């Protein structure tokens, strides 16, 4: 097995991938709660990133660590859960449905990943809108094929399919890809301190 020291991680990754992430090296064992342990500099950092909010309960939550062996056994096989079912999947869905699913919504839909999550929300919104227009006797896509999704400037929603038309943080992330010309709204951010220049900018927003 290859062994790499924390101070070698970035140089090693750079030989094979675009390694432009943060300058720290996460210690998967010593990170805990809302604290990342950086093994590159042997320090703890307050985690206000939470991996784009995909880790809402923090690092190494005790209840998850208790199930480490079970979770590891399940994770060995990356099953296509839409096609192949297991007892473990049924138990997970039953638990999530009992604790998190609102009574007025009969079904759940699961997506792994932020961009695909955004993309499926867009598809659900488009589907709902077209069904709503049909119920009202209004023209559908055949007569009005252009669907617009309003979104903020400075937004990053991913780089897959529809999300390319929403992402606009850095042109290099979306250049050379076909995109929809959807309306972009000024991001109503506030820059501190609020001086005369900032007040004037806010008035324009």
Predicted regions and their residues:
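N-terminal glycine-rich, Lys/His-bearing helix-loop that initiates the first secondary-structure elements
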Residues: 1-104, 178, 195-197, 201-203
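PLP-dependent aspartate aminotransferase-fold enzymes
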Residues: 94-205
């Amino acid at each position: 097995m290859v062994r790499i020291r924390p101070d070698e991680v970035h140089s090693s990754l750079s030989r094979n991938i675009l390694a432009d992430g943060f300058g720290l090296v996460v210690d998967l064992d010593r990170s805990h709660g809302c604290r990342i342990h950086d093994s590159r500099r042997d320090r703890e950092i307050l985690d206000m990133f939470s991996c784009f909010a995909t880790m809402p309960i923090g690092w190494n939550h005790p209840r998850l660590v208790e199930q480490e062996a079970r979770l590891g056994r399940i994770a060995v096989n990356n099953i296509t859960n839409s096609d192949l079912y297991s007892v473990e999947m049924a138990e997970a869905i039953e638990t999530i449905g009992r604790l998190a699913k609102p009574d007025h919504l009969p079904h759940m839909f699961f997506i792994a990943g932020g961009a695909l999550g955004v993309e499926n929300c867009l598809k659900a919104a488009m589907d709902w809108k077209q069904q709503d227009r049909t119920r009202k006797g209004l023209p559908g896509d055949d007569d009005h094929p252009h669907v617009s999704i309003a979104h903020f400037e400075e937004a990053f929603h991913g780089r897959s399919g529809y999300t390319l038309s929403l992402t606009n943080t850095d042109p290099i992330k979306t250049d050379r890809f076909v995109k929809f010309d959807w309306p972009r709204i000024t991001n109503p951010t506030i820059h501190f301190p609020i001086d005369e220049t900032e007040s004037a900018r806010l008035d324009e927003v």
